[in-house]
Structures are given as C-alpha cells and as structure tokens.
C-alpha cells in the first residue's frame, strides 16, 4: 500500500471514530423546558372559613364548598380553588402592604350581579372614586372611559373629557366587593361563564417581575405582549394618578405587566406607596398555589437558578409541595399534581 493510500485510510478511520465518539455534555441537545404550571389555588387566612365560603358561594353561585387535603375550600368550575386556613385573629388585610392586592371573578351579567348584591346587606359594595374631589360609581363604565389602553384618566384628561362632553360607555366593566376578613374582590363582565379568573398584584418592578415569572416558572404572557429584557426592565413609576380608583387619591396605572397560568391571570401595577412591599405569609392573601407534574424536577431547576426557597418539599395531604418567594416577596406554592390528577 502506498503512502498516499495509507494516509487516506487513516483519515477515513479518524473521521469515523470522531463521528462515533459520544458527544460531550456541552454539546448535548438542550433539555426540554418543564411544562408550565397551572393555577391551582389561592390560599386565604380567615377567622371563620365556613362563613367565608358561604359568602363566596352566595356571591358567585357557580362555586361550591369542598375540602381539599384537609383544607376548607371553595371550588370554581374551571378547576381552581380558594383554600382557607383558620386563624385566631383577623389577618392583616391592607391591600397595599404586600404584592397580593385582590382577586376576582368573571361574571356573566355584571349589572345583574350588582343588583343582586344591593339586595343583600351582608354583601358590601366597594365604590370607585371618579375624581380626587369625590363622586363614586359602582361600575367603572359609569364614569369617563380610559384611553390608550389605560383603564383610567388623569386629572388633565378628566378635565378634557368634561370639556368635550365625553359620556360614560355604560354596560359591563369592573366592580368590587368587600368580603369576609376585609377581602377585596373584583367582579367583571360580561363573559360566557362565571369563573375565578385573576389575582391582581403590586410589584416593585413590574417588567422585571414578568421576566422572573417567565424565566423561573415558564409563565405565559397575554396575547400581543412583548417582554422587556433584564437590561431595560427597571423603569420609573408613572408620575400621575388616574381614576376611577378604590382610593380617593386615585392610583398609579403605569407601568403594568402580568402573566398567565392556565386560564388564570396574575396582573400587576407598580407599588402604590413609598413603603417597600413585605412578605405575604400570614396576611389575608397568604399565597397562591401552582400545580406541577414533577416536584423534584422543579425543585432542582429553582435551586440551580438561585430562587429563594421558603420551604423545601413537604407533605401536603396526599401529595407534596414546596414554597418559593417571588420578586416582591410574594409566597408561591408549587403543588405536585401528576398528569390526570383532578
């Protein structure tokens, strides 16, 4: 065999050997991301869970009383629950103290719901202020409509709307109730079916919080939303308040962001006060629960990403869970619910 042929043969064998050699870890195909969690429950602290559940079942008749792993619970037809822990003293319920502001339902006929609530004195309506001078409505669509995708108007915009004779749109919109333990509850219409549909929040940095939920919990975004990056997610809170609002002084509505788990939205505005948000454990809204298929895989992922773990995996009735802390100190429980679980 000539030198040229021997050289060619060596080259062929070398190529074959390299092709057959196992690829290194760095060259391996990336693992598929874990399936996004679904919204499982909202967990409230209450001095009287049974009374609270009766209130919600009356206000939202699609819901029903149940028990889940020993917790008194309210079941919504979209496979979402509100769980309760009985406490000896009223829980702190300041809606601006923590990341969890309020929670709410979609309803089929908002005006019909409003009339029903008015007929029942045990249900307290929470009015919306239309300006900082006073004046209230029960439904946001009974005052000047927002503009530019913002659900309110600033002082200057209200003055302009008055000057132009702008009229309320009427019809469905959003409204609020005061519930047991001083809970703040939103109901909005009109939708094809009644269901628990959102948790509204405050965040220190709304865009950064959205990135956090995407990165660590594989959250989905609302349609048409394009997230910022870590390089530009920190922004200054909008300078002007707008109305209508639950507070007479109005509220800051920019910036805003949010994510979706299953068919439940978690939306937020920036913190409304100058006081940093505190942890949610022990408050009226203690935490939210998200269901995952493989808790061990999620625990490993979150540890590797440096997420703050409030409680390592623990027994929760006939399943397991772990508790982590979100970007503004909100507690989030991950509940192991294998595929096919109810």
Label each region the model flagged.
Residues 12-22:
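Bacterial N-terminal signal peptides
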Residues 27-34, 115-201, 220-260, 265-270, ...:
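Vicinal oxygen chelate
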Residues 39, 49, 53-57, 100, ...:
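Extracytoplasmic/secreted envelope proteins and their assembly/folding machinery
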Residues 76-118:
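Mid-chain, structured segments of secreted extracytoplasmic proteins
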Residues 43-48, 106-108, 201-206, 290-293:
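Short, surface-exposed ligand-recognition loops at beta-strand->loop->(often short) alpha-helix junctions
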Residues 1-9:
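N-terminal secretory signal peptides that target proteins for export/translocation
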Residues 33-68:
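Mature N-terminal segment immediately following signal peptide/propeptide cleavage
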Residues 52-57, 117, 182, 209-214, ...:
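Conserved active-site tyrosine of GNAT-family acetyltransferases
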């Amino acid at each position: 065999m000539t030198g040229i042929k021997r050289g060619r043969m060596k080259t062929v064998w070398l190529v074959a050997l390299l092709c057959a050699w196992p690829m290194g870890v760095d060259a391996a195909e990336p693992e598929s991301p874990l399936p996004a969690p679904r919204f499982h429950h909202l967990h409230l602290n209450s001095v009287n869970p049974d009374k609270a559940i009766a209130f919600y079942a009356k206000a939202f008749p699609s819901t029903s009383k149940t028990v889940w792993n020993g917790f008194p619970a309210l079941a919504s037809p979209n496979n979402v629950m509100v769980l309760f822990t009985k406490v000896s003293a009223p829980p702190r319920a300041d809606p601006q103290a923590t990341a969890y502001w309020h929670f709410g339902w979609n309803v089929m006929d908002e005006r019909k719901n409003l009339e029903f609530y008015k007929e029942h004195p045990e249900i307290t309506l929470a009015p919306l202020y239309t300006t900082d001078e006073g004046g209230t409505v029960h439904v946001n669509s009974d005052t000047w409509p927002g503009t530019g995708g913002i659900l309110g108007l600033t002082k200057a915009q209200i003055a302009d709307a008055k000057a132009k004779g702008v009229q309320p749109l009427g019809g469905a919109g959003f409204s609020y109730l005061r519930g047991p333990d001083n809970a703040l509850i939103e109901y909005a219409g009109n939708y094809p079916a009644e269901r628990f549909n959102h948790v509204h929040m405050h965040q220190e940095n709304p865009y950064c919080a959205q990135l956090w939920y995407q990165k660590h919990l594989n959250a989905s975004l609302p349609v048409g939303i394009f997230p910022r990056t870590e390089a530009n997610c920190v922004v200054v809170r909008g300078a002007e308040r707008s109305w209508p609002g639950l507070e007479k002084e109005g509220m800051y509505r920019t910036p805003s962001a949010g994510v979706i788990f299953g068919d439940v939205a978690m939306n937020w505005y920036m913190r409304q006060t100058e006081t940093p948000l505190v942890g949610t454990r022990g408050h009226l809204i203690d935490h939210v629960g998200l269901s995952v298929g493989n808790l061990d895989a999620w625990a490993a992922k979150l540890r590797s990403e440096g997420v703050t773990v409030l409680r390592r995996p623990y027994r929760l009735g006939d399943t397991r869970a772990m508790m982590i802390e979100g970007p503004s100190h909100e507690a989030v429980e991950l509940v192991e619910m294998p595929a096919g679980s109810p």
